[in-house]
Amino acid sequence: MAAPLLQTRDLSMRFGGVQAVRDVNFTLAEGELRCLIGPNGAGKSTFFKMLTGQLQPSQGQVLFRGHDISNAHAHQIARLGIGIKTQVPSVFDGLSVRENIWLAAGRIHSGKRVDGVVDEMLERIGLTGAANRLVGQLAHGQRQWAELGIVLSTDPELILLDEPAAGMTHEEVYKTAELVREINRSKALIVVEHDMQFIRMIARTVTVFSQGAVLVEGSVDTVLSDQRVKDVYLGRRAA
């Protein structure tokens, strides 16, 4: 059996007397796309931050290709081959889309290859026509796609996305879903998301968080029809 790409073992996080995440065991296979869902305060965002190095766990481990990255910081995790896109785009508003992607691609490519990678990425994210526009002038959805292009241009093995569809129009959500599915042909992804329409567009397997722990995990149709999941989203305490 192939070793998992990413794994957590008894991962927990406390903030003072509050147990935000409790003993989470999670496994992601090579090339898998996994969605993390749950109501506000369920623990999924804290779990995500431990995967990305924004928080160090109180106990337990995060393993990437078998290596313990539990105490690594975000910049160290990025160098290992994990691309991270948070809710707030981390782009340079005063630079063009092309310049933003060029800076990221230049970290791992050199010479003429950088320009080729940038052109390929602009086409991939559908922003060739906006390549020379300042990122600060882009619509919300375009800014999100620009940051996806930045993350992709560093050629990570695993991409972590935090609510990529937040604040988007229906058309932007549809295009983002298409882009995520296309990315998943060659990359593994973990996506934290609230938009159920978007989840149905992209997900095969879903992990549901409730009260800091994994409530249920399985195929998207099975999970979203599970009465425990419905109860959690309606505000009832899960059995």
Question: Residue locations for each model-derived region?
Answer:
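Glycine-rich phosphate-binding loops of nucleotide-dependent enzymes
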Residues: 2-239
